[in-house]
Amino acid sequence: MSRSGAAAEKADSRQRPQMKVNEYKENQNIAYVSLRPVQTTVLIKTAKVYLAPFSLSNYQLDQLMCPKSLLEKNSNNEVACKKTKIKKTCSRIIPPKMKTTSSKSESTLQNSASAVHTESNKLQPKRTADAMNLSVDVESSQDEDSDEDITPGLDDFSGLSPYERKRLKNISENADFFASLQLSESAARLREIIEKRQPPKSKRKKPKRENGVGCRRSMRLLKVDPSGVSLPATPTPPTLVADETPLLPPGPLEMTSENQEDNERFKGFLHTWAGMNKPSSKNTEKGLSSIKSYRANLNGMVISEDTVYKVTTGPIFSMALHPSETRTLVAVGAKFGQVGLCDLTQQPKEDGVYVFHPHSQPVSCLYFSPANPAHILSLSYDGTLRCGDFSRAIFEEVYRNERSSFSSFDFLSEDASTLIVGHWDGNMSLVDRRTPGTSYEKLTSSSMGKIRTVHVHPVHRQYFITAGLRDTHIYDARQLKSRGSQPLISLTEHTKSIASAYFSPLTGNRVVTTCADCNLRIFDSSCVSSKIPLLTTIRHNTFTGRWLTRFQAMWDPKQEDCVIVGSMAHPRRVEIFHETGKRVHSFGGECLVSVCSINAMHPTRYILAGGNSSGKIHVFMNEKSC
């Protein structure tokens, strides 16, 4: 009976359910441990530990200290409270025989887990709810055998795997190594040395501001020297007056010579004009000469010192030869508003030069009247057009416009009663001398930005040609409108600005233009239609620069198939070209030492006059005419 009862009791003990306690053991990444005991049926004796990986890469030097200091520094009240509760719970559940073994494991595991607890909180602060349940199955009959000793000091971790025990050993060794380096003590000593070397900071005393003195200013602006003495006042520079000559008063001006003091000689000169107040009966309608005879006459023209005259003080802008057959009179317009007249028949030659001042700015255009040879008309940049009457010794005002600047003019009628005037701003004016006053009859604008020259067709006088900025237009005076006029024909072959454009003097069948692209162009204008063809392009250096008057190719009034133009070549010369482009003749000599930009030929006699930029005229003439 006793044996059977013992066997039954032993079988009941095997079938009796055993209690499994979730014992709190500090391990890596343990953030929460359940304190509620769980009853489980234990079939075998097992010990299970769930581990989570972690890293020491985020540890700082002051955190890698000895395990004892780490435990004191990183343990908090929450862990202590949880440990106390677990101990109380386990004491009620674990038998006395089992407490001895559990206390040893708990104390050792607590030390290692507290060191990892800080790292777990830093790496995964949000995962406090993820806890690992460490369950230990305790049998009713616990063996007295102790765990194997693998590593000294780790006897209480016999339930861990060899990897975990090696890992805890490495943690302990690393902590001991960093503790032996004494980094905290070295850092403290270095900090003390740095603080000792820093000089004491001294507070800078702000200077007291003197009463009445504001912001600091330079002595130059205060106009004082370094000693504080005021400097003398800087002399003010003289005011620069604009280089503009005031306009002459409106109305007629008395004709007085600026370079002749002998009034009796000047009066005698004026009386000689009485016999020249009628136009010459000779004309040039007999036809053109042959090129051979024309060249022979040109070869007979010479220059000498007696035919070089100093007339004006500034550059010559315009020139005209009187059509007289008996006297040789050359008129020039200069830069400073002067009009000079040179009588080549007067001896000595200084007595034959007379200079007048009817304008205040450059005289850009000059003509003797075709109806009255005793009249000379001059146009200036100052916006005035005057007529000099030598029989009355007076300069009458024909047209005045102070708001505009004139560039050129020509006669629309043979009796010189109506004029066409070109403006520098591209406008054009019709002027009738028979109308009282000094105003225009019609003012019209053109599509040209600037007008340099105006020339009327010699036969069909209703047509006139204008030259300007890359444009050459032919207009009909009968179709001019106040609101703007459109040209009949435009010559568009030019690539740069055009200095001049002139019809041939007898028939008007040709047009010659002088362009800044170093070309002379001759057009066929025999039929004024929608297009005027280009006949010839003559290569010629027209680049005069800033200080020389621009070249203007002119037709020879006796030979309308030949043009006269100045030259930049050396030695200095004046050249004549045929309309085919061939050079007919070249004027030169020892007395010609400058560039003659403006040239004029006598309408019936073989006399050529050229003006330069110093106010001199050079006259080439036949020896019989000298």
Swiss-Prot record:
Interacts with CUL4A and/or CUL4B. One of its GO terms (biological process) is DNA damage response. It comes from the Eukaryota. Residues 140-150 have a biased composition (Acidic residues). Specifically binds 5-hydroxymethylcytosine (5hmC), suggesting that it acts as a specific reader of 5hmC. Keywords: Repeat, WD repeat. The gene is WDR76. This is WD repeat-containing protein 76. Residues 109-123 have a biased composition (Polar residues). Residues 1-20, 97-161, 194-213 are annotated as: Disordered. Residues 97-108 have a biased composition (Low complexity). InterPro entries: WD40/YVTN_repeat-like_dom_sf, WD40_repeat_dom_sf, WD40_rpt, WD_repeat_DNA-damage-binding.
